[in-house]
Amino acid sequence: MRLIIAEKHSVGQAIAQAVGGHMEKHDGYVQVGDDLVTWAQGHLVDLAAPDEYKNHDWGKWSLDTLPIDPTPDWQWKVGRDKGADRQYKVVAGLMRRGDVDMLVDACDPDREGEAIFRRIVTHVGVSKPMRRLWVASLEEDAIRDALASMKDETEYQGLADSAMIRAKADWLIGMNASRAYSLVYNARFTVGRVQTPTLAMIVDRDRQIAGHVSRPYWKVVAPMGGWKLSGERLDKREDAEMLLRIVNSDDFAFSIFKAERKQQHDAPPRLYDLTGLQKDMSRLHGLTAARTLAALQSLYERKLATYPRTCLLYTSDAADDTPCV
């Protein structure tokens, strides 16, 4: 019997519908024929906080305990979101069932999706054959095609390793640097691998804007029988006036040294990735990045858009069968 683990309830339901057959609903999972389908709640399992390491005195905020580094004995914990502990027990119980002989990773098709599945497997401590269901659309045909072409989970080990490295780097920098700055400056600070450099870039840009001193410049624009020839910016007014006198002199003539005509093909614009869409929604409609992602996630779960958290600008061959809108 296969146990298919999706990242969230709505995706699990879509997969169960695509599998087809008689469906029995249970608390935290559904059974469809000989398949079990369950789901996480995002990051159901995460790295433990320093104060949760009982064999270390890391609960006390002190410079004497820094740096904190659990390597190689990293510990995991179930997330604190509402219902996380209950759903974890459901998933863990299903994974340990004797009639479950295969685990299917159906979490989101990206690095974090891979991390969510691997962390659950690690924390539960089971060792069973694992396959990867890689699908970016919740259309039933797309899910069925993905089920028929699953690969061994070991082929995604590099993706899993990158997720683990990212998580541990964030933990080490965040836990150590946040405590260090807070203790040194006697105030609560949060320092992050991504957050802090990003804030620094924003502050630097804000300072550049605040310290900007506008400087005048001059340009000479000459009308040319229906179009205009514009010169470069000039820092000195006298230079612009001298150029203007030359252009207006009776013996001055414009000459065309080279004219070229060629046929050019402009390809249609590429599809959006998440960042590009968030930029345009902010610029055109004033939407925050979070609101844009929430709207796109809702469209994805309604089978009206492909997986939103991607940097890819292309679709699969399945898009050829998508009806035109």
Predicted regions and their residues:
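Conserved ATP-binding/catalytic motifs of P-loop helicase motor domains
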Residues: P129, L199, A305
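Conserved small/polar residues in nucleotide/adenosyl-binding loops
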Residues: Y314-A319
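C-terminal or mid-to-C-terminal helical accessory/interaction module adjacent to the motor/catalytic core
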Residues: I143-Y217
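Intrinsically disordered, low-complexity regulatory segments
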Residues: M1-A167, W171
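Long, highly charged, low-complexity internal segments
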Residues: D34-L36, L44-K82, G93, F189-E301
